[in-house]
Amino acid sequence: MKRTNRRAFLATTVTGTAALVAGALGRADDAKPQTSLAALILAGGQMAMAQARYAAMARQADADGYGQAASLFRAAARSKEANVTDLGAVIKKLGGKLECDAKPGEVKSTKENVAALIKAETEAGETTLPELVAVAREEKNKEAVRALNYAKAAAAEYATLFAEAAADLEAWKAGKKSVYVCTVCGFPAYTLPEKKCPTCFDALDKFTQVS
């Protein structure tokens, strides 16, 4: 196979893989990646699915009367959007392409959705993404390690924020809640950091307010 044809073949394969993993949230034991590119594709599919799912959960929270929880769900969706953009850019540099037909999946009551998000983000931050980082680190792919670590850090933050919400969910009914989201790495905060993003160290003008 000629080199140019091989690159086209690989790009097509990666695109197909993205479609297969787009529905994943959490571990994917039957599809453990062996390369940085495959790890990025898997993570990108997961992030795209989470983005769609959390946006749908935000709408459900609004319908259930949990305005502040809806704001946090919207922030989570915005963070995943940032992660998808970042991961997709690194995938492109490696000659791949991220194409995901992400659907929200099952959306239940707000209480159940909060619990589902905590479980998914905890698993992503503590297990799935660290495993993918290890794959990228083995190949010494610094860009892949960086992008995956950004996604991992954001997942850990949301697991904590939603655990706090779950502890007193009834208090999250009144009004909206402002969340500042870094559009580079997805880091969320209720108040702007003093000088720069604590995860990616970008300037504060990279933050967007979500409510």
Predicted region positions:
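Non-heme di-metal
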Residues: 2-5, 10-21, 28-211
